[in-house]
Regions:
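As written
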Residues: 33, 47, 79-84
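Interdomain helical linkers/hinges and coiled-coil/dimerization scaffolds
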Residues: 79, 85-135
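Two-component/phosphorelay signaling modules centered on CheY-like receiver
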Residues: 1-16, 30
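Helix N-cap/capping motif at the beta->alpha junctions
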Residues: 17-26, 47
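Two-component signal transduction core modules
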Residues: 36, 63, 78, 86-87
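Active-site residues of response regulator receiver
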Residues: 39
Length: 135
């Protein structure tokens, strides 16, 4: 269903689907992803446990949890783990689109900031080297 919605809204994501939490963790151990969209209730490993392992591997990973659990303790645990969004089912398609657009914007901002920091560091390094060589 989520793949369908991502495709419907023409979001610029390459989607990899996992059949359960362990499968998803296997994918995460093999390659880097920018966003993890997961359900809480899954076989073998729930979404909170998956989020914990995923964020240990990639602290910058954006995790969006979708849950049918209205018990606030699940949301509290997700917040403690560093999950960026926690959505309750049933999900409205536009709500998912808005959240994913927001997450995508924050990823773009982070990438831009990293490039800017790198350019600033290179400029300072070159400037200092030039200054040192001119004496």
């Amino acid at each position: 269903m989520y793949c369908f919605l991502i495709s419907k809204f023409k979001l610029p994501f390459e989607v990899t689907s996992a059949i359960n939490g362990e499968d998803a963790l296997g994918y995460l151990q093999q390659e880097h992803f920018d966003i993890l969209l997961t359900d809480i209730q899954m076989p073998f490993m729930d979404g909170l446990e998956l989020s914990k392992h995923a964020l240990a591997l990639y602290p910058d990973l954006r995790v969006v949890i979708i849950s049918a659990h209205e018990d606030f303790s699940y949301a509290q645990t997700a917040i403690r783990l560093g999950v960026c969004e926690y959505l309750l089912k049933p999900i409205q398609p536009q709500e998912l689109n808005n959240i994913l657009q927001k997450v995508l914007s924050s990823i773009k901002e982070q990438h831009l900031q990293k490039r800017l920091d790198s350019m600033t560091a290179n400029y300072a390094k070159n400037h200092l080297l030039t200054s040192a060589n001119s004496r």
